[in-house]
């Protein structure tokens, strides 16, 4: 079976490493993402999200975020062959035996309304900002907030900063109105871990109008491996890789073939797809994509599409 190098745009391993400081990123079996599993699965570049448990006390969230950055520096980056990607163009400089890792920020709860803290995270290497998780914060409402408001003044300030620093804005958890505000104002937009609402009705998936807006903007859509976002109401058991490929094929046929990628959400999901249960099994998905949509497209969705975006825009 051919091995395709993969850029995985979302995982929550930093949360686990911060909560369990005795875990080694090299080989701890409790992690979906570790060095051994990344190598076995052919993952060449892994995004590591800073994500704070929504139940954490609000005054502690900033410190928790800093603690996750410490876990990134003192555990992830200490492993042999792991390289910190601070600018996307550096991906092309990775050696054959190296794996690149980069930071993203999932939700702005940890900064309150302090733009200086956002700048600090970008200075630490954050290359993408998700304005919200599912809840509301001082930048925007998340998709789980019934009010459904869009960006606040602070939220627009964050987008402006991201534009100035060539940082992505991630729309995977944002409210519908927030999505529209981001698409109207952000320079680089990604849905780092979302699927197709028409095929699985979860509120976090993209609806037809959002898909069209992403297409028109040339924004990136990366698919998530959580079975609840793949298998609507668990209509069939078990959830299979072929069902996830249905979502990919849907957007391929909708004209977004050159904008698609992968964002597993490993270490952030407990409900898995059969034979796609950790990073070591990543090539199983690429094999099914190649069977259905061809080897060239499998290469594109795994790595090529994103690198072409980087070469055009960075």
Residue ranges and their predicted role:
Residues 10, 38, 87, 125, ...:
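Conserved, mostly hydrophobic/aromatic
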Residues 10-14, 51-53, 104-108, 134-136, ...:
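Active-site beta-loop-alpha junctions enriched in small/polar residues
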